[in-house]
């Protein structure tokens, strides 16, 4: 399993045993044009399962993960998305994901709105986070999924509902070609240090500041 599945492949550089899909070959050409060092980095990393973090106060962390999931499914990969805090509220992407069958599975593992803060944290929410993490750990280590998205897990960690070291330990043990995306504000430094790619979303302005409500089909 992994990213190199396309029937259209190219042999790269002086090593004819390395075979890339058309899209990966294009990326290699771009890297090569930037210089041998960049091309060498591309060849070293092309078969690595990435740890990606989408964090920051701006909008689009889950949306970006969904876009990556769509790209992955289009390349023949299997995707599991576990939403740690989202509950039964209906999101448009749930309907879309169903059309992919077992190639893209999405599960809402929480109750939606979480009350946090010391003794006020609801034990039921903590229990549900524990269940979500148990399923996530099994899914990651099984190697049955090419991409596992841990949506809102950064919130669960920052709310002290989940120990970051437990998450880090599983990330260190993950199968080589399994990709992981972790989303949510306030990504823990331990997770950031382990990640290959970290993007911090920054809010410049938002429609709600003008009193415009979330738009169906765009934001949910």
Describe the residue ranges of each PLM region:
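Structural recognition of the conserved hydrophobic beta-strand(s) that form the central parallel beta-sheet
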Residues: 150, 179-184
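Conserved nucleotide-binding/hydrolysis micro-motifs of P-loop NTPases
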Residues: 85-89, 112-113, 154-155, 186-189, ...
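Phosphate-binding/switch loop-helix module in NTP-utilizing enzymes
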Residues: 116-176
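Phosphate-binding/switch region of NTP-binding enzymes
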Residues: 185-220
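Phosphate-binding P-loop
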Residues: 43-49
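Intrinsic, low-complexity polybasic segments
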Residues: 2-3, 8-15, 19-20, 32
